[in-house]
């Protein structure tokens, strides 16, 4: 029987109904409460621990045998136990709001009559920093809050109630409840017990009122884009179940072979060339359908009706339609996938089992009711016990749907404070839940927890019986065009089975009309949304929560030109042991049956193997990282023979993405992590992943060409509650528009770096981040071979921590990597237009004097406009050179020494910063790492009126950085080498170093300069008549006065071109030039060198008048 078009009136009626259902609601669904009821936080044997100095056993706290009251428990004391013990909660306490009356209550009774050794006098209720609990009972630290010692009727053998009201004067976020129980004496010669029941903290009820401080924007500095406000346009006259005269009902026997409707246990093939409609009455809603094939030129269309379909496999070569872009279905449709774990292909060859596979040339469209926005952010703080929240965007969510509120703590996986709640009532931006919120959630101007809708009317899920124990759910795979919108995918994916993901574009090539929009993936066994070997698709406005392995997943490194926008990923778990490591090396993982993709040891919300894609308005909560950009020197998987280098592609577009609560497993972990290395071992066919440092250089079109180097650029980015906000091991990065809040450090950046228009906030108002011994730094300058410019940046709320034992480990704005004598800084760091808010002067710079460390002695940066140092110098607008604690940096009388910062600060004037290296073949070379205490002399300033000693030490590890256009006097305690090479690593065009080195009287010299890679710049340095002539010359002359050899070091390769420096906002950092060398060969027949060194030379600086 054919299904013909309905009449025009019916079409208009359907359109009206649809629009009425989908309009963004302004009227309430359900009834809002006016009073928030009280909330009880209950304690019993399961969530309390017995702690004492001695007499502790597994039986010290136990359930009461025979009791029907689950709250009842006993404390069981042995003989001669201590006079007090503690009950410590195993879980964190609710947040406690200042100046609010809470109650702590319980019932108590003695196990035997009151006596000399059975006398309980008092108790004390306290709340401690969670980390301090580890010190109990031997070291009791100061609590966040404690009550006075309280008594009660603790002398009865029948239950007596005790209610204690307590009020804190400060807000308390993370804490652990501790109850101290005090006895009059030790426990005595016989065992005894006491009993508790109904122990609880009660959060009081309160009127529900609209907060006066609702946010009107989500960020202070940056702009985070949002999706369009309007709903997608609908035309229900185009619904697939209405519009065609050639549409046949599934239950019509005339279309099937032999005139019989197939049974569920058959392999069912849709008749060739037919368009078949499934309605609720067409199929069994309880039996499991085995396999359905939709051949080429056939279509399987679902009606917009409430129903459930149980299925094992569906293979689509033609079309599978359950709603379209113009006709999104309003009905509640459940597709449940069944099947035991197997690696066999039961859908079709290469397509696995338990799911839907769409062949190349096939088409699938599943589009349910549009809920918009799919996620928002809190508009105000939420406290434990609250049931009503306000969000920042209007939504059309519905009563009974499930909502996620993401965590507001740092270590998401280790302290899960994400919450799923059910809507009781909703109106505009106001939502009431059926149950109280357990944990404090932050929603102030700095940042806000995300609030996401998990429920959808169309649900694809896996049956629990065959899925949960094996992590083997259903999967959707399409090699053709695929459109999914308004669908929830629950318990989907097949853990560690490649290509078996909840929703997956698979080897589709370049598609033209494919998208996944406003869907949700929840409780996924393996990933969330995958783009594999497919280009030009859109993932937008989706939500993902609670998934194993990388979530939004670009698989092989060849996926480009995709648009990934306005998506949320949250609570993403590594597979197996998380990648850790206490150094930049990270950890290495190998492909195995338990870790099919070894990079899942560092599972992230967004995993990006090729950067040439657009990322707009996405948010990541949790994961090993929020956004991971692993380095792939070659594609992997199906594309490993393709001749491209994925890691060389720059980011196509990055605008307004945020991340939080990640980066804590690895010392160098970050919420945005550009690092790690994923390779394919050709010998054994296995993948290898290393989580540590590997650099990348990006080029136009991903093709290596030194003339087409292109910067990665992150625009309008926000990171909070992270270890490192952005960790970038690459060579060229610009971060423009950036907010960092409550991160250990905002960034760790390598190569050419520009951080511009940033807000770095060391401490937000989030009470969950306070009372921590973790300190935070504003920016750590690296130690060598980078170029870093920070401009237009606000640093806020860096306050001294009493727990900090070193300057550079305190809550301080500027620090540097200063541990090494091998890796020493050149002129690599500069600042301009820096602002400090609530930062005491002592916390602006934290330089540490590290023993035997050249990087500590040579710490330096250019304060390009004096804005960093003006609070100390009183010289705003005047550029300053900042150098370490050694007198080497005191180059003129403008220099001031800050004891708070442990640095010298000097007017830059006409000076610059330069770096050279002394090389003695076989003794002191760049590639020969030596002990840090291998001291061989010193280098001092001379001339320019300097009469005192201003020097630093030299070691066998080459490298010295100092002020250019000055006299440098090098003295070698081991003796001056008769052959010395000097690498002019960083001497900018127009600058010089006036170098003096002692030699014995009568020494003659052969001096040349050369470029390692060309003889075009080879010069013979000739003798002139005076040291002054050398200083005023062009760098091609030397002079020896019988005591000192004078040379003017310049780099003849430099011409002043723009390519010779890293230049942003008027600040220039010269490049390190590889490798322009001066060669000095010295001969003396009267006082010859001994083993290559002229010994016992006097240490006398040249004249101060030079």
Swiss-Prot record:
Residues bearing carbohydrate: 267, 306, 512, 536, 677, 715, 833
UniProt similarity note: Belongs to the comF family.
Main location as per UniProt: secreted
InterPro entries, per database record: CEMIP_beta-hel_dom, G8_domain, G8_domain-comF-like
PROSITE patterns in alphabetical order: G8 (PS51484)
Key word Glycoprotein present: yes
GO cellular component: extracellular region
Short name of one Pfam family: G8
Gene that encodes the chain: comF-1
Domain of life from the UniProt record: Eukaryota
Compartments reported by the entry: Secreted
An annotated GO BP: aggregation involved in sorocarp development
Annotated keywords: Glycoprotein, Secreted, Signal
Keyword Thylakoid carried by entry: no
Signal peptide: 1-28
Organism: Dictyostelium discoideum (Social amoeba)
Descriptive protein name: Communication mutant protein F
UniProt note: phenotype after gene disruption: Shows no aggregation.
Domain G8: 254-380
